[in-house]
Amino acid sequence: MRKNSIKNIRINEEVMRELSNIIRGEIKDPRINPMTSVVAVEVAPDLKTAKAYISVLGDKKSQADTLAGLKSAEGYIRRTLAKNINLRNTPAITFIIDQSIEYGVEMSKKIDEVTKNLKED
């Protein structure tokens, strides 16, 4: 299976949907911020590994705590994923903090600041 095949795209979407449900509804770890969302998932073509990009609303400490909580619940998440999705192999999940939303907000603020300065001149 190639990386961008239709089958792989469908698997990515299904894993992302299930991960969102598991994180939102089934994990009771207090370290995990309730405002955590799964932005994207990339499952390897051999279905052995997956990268889950998560976005956490909050400061850096909240992001670090959420990442630590998800890493400690990795085994539970993988077992639950195996029960809910019928795949040949259940991928080992690596959680990565997605900084793109923060970066976009920061760039938007900079653009607003520059346009404000141009209007004043």
From Swiss-Prot:
Its main location: cytoplasm. Keywords: Cytoplasm, Ribosome biogenesis. GO terms for cellular component: cytosol. It is found in: Cytoplasm. It holds the Pfam family RBFA. GO terms for biological process: maturation of SSU-rRNA. PROSITE patterns: RBFA. It comes from the Bacteria. GO terms for molecular function: ribosomal small subunit binding. Belongs to the RbfA family. One of several proteins that assist in the late maturation steps of the functional core of the 30S ribosomal subunit. Associates with free 30S ribosomal subunits (but not with 30S subunits that are part of 70S ribosomes or polysomes). Required for efficient processing of 16S rRNA. May interact with the 5'-terminal helix region of 16S rRNA. Monomer. Binds 30S ribosomal subunits, but not 50S ribosomal subunits or 70S ribosomes. This is Ribosome-binding factor A. It comes from Agathobacter rectalis (strain ATCC 33656 / DSM 3377 / JCM 17463 / KCTC 5835 / VPI 0990) (Eubacterium rectale).
